[in-house]
C-alpha cells in the first residue's frame, strides 16, 4: 500500500539537505526514487486531480460540520510534490525533468483552480481554513486572488474566536498564510487559545 499523498517529507528532506547544508548528495543518491514516488502520484491522478487519500487533513481539533475535501488536500500535496521535484531536478541539473515538472506544475495548478476555485467567494473547495491556506501557501492560487483568499482564512479564524480548524496537514499552512498576510497576531491568539 503506498503512502498518503500528503507524505511530502521524503522530498523535503532532500531539498532541505541542500538548502541548509549545501549537500546535494541526498538529491543525487535518491533522485530516481524521489522521481518514482512523484510519478506514482501522477499516475494516481486524472487530469492532475488525485484519486485517493488515506488521511487527508487528519486530527482536526474539533468535530467540524464542514471538513476539508480530502481529495483536494491530496491534490494540493501532489502540486507540492511537483514543485519539490522540480527544485530537486534543478539541484542535480536534470534539464529534461526541470522542463517536465515545470509543465506538470502549471497543468496541476490549472486543474485545481478550474475544479476547486470559486471566483465569486474567493474560496477553494469547501472554503475551510485548510483548503484556502494550502492554495495560498503552496502557490496554487493566482497572484491576483491570494490576498482575498488569505483574508478568508483570517476571517474564518476570527469568526471562530481565534481557533484553528485545521488538522495535522493544514495547520502550518494556516499559520504561514496568517503571518505572511499581516495577521501574525492571530497566530499568537490561536496558540494562546
Where are these regions (language model features)?
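Active-site core of glycosidic bond-cleaving carbohydrate-active enzymes
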Residues: 1-193
Amino acid at each position: 500500500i503506498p503512502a498518503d499523498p500528503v507524505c511530502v517529507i521524503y522530498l523535503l528532506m532532500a531539498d532541505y539537505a541542500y538548502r541548509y547544508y549545501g549537500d546535494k548528495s541526498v538529491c543525487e543518491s535518491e533522485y530516481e526514487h524521489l522521481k518514482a514516488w512523484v510519478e506514482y502520484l501522477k499516475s494516481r491522478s486524472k487530469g492532475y486531480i488525485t484519486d485517493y487519500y488515506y488521511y487527508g487533513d487528519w486530527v482536526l481539533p474539533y468535530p467540524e460540520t464542514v471538513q476539508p475535501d480530502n481529495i483536494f488536500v491530496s491534490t494540493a500535496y501532489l502540486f507540492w510534490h511537483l514543485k519539490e521535484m522540480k527544485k530537486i531536478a534543478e539541484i542535480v541539473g536534470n534539464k529534461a525533468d526541470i522542463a517536465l515538472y515545470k509543465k506538470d506544475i502549471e497543468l496541476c495548478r490549472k486543474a485545481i483552480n478550474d475544479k476547486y476555485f470559486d471566483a465569486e467567494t474567493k474560496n477553494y473547495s469547501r472554503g475551510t481554513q485548510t483548503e484556502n491556506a494550502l492554495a495560498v501557501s503552496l502557490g496554487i492560487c493566482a497572484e491576483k486572488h491570494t490576498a482575498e483568499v488569505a483574508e478568508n482564512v483570517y476571517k474564518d479564524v476570527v469568526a471562530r474566536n481565534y481557533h484553528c480548524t485545521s488538522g495535522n496537514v493544514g495547520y502550518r499552512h494556516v499559520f504561514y498564510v496568517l503571518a505572511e498576510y499581516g495577521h501574525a497576531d492571530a497566530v499568537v491568539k490561536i496558540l494562546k487559545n
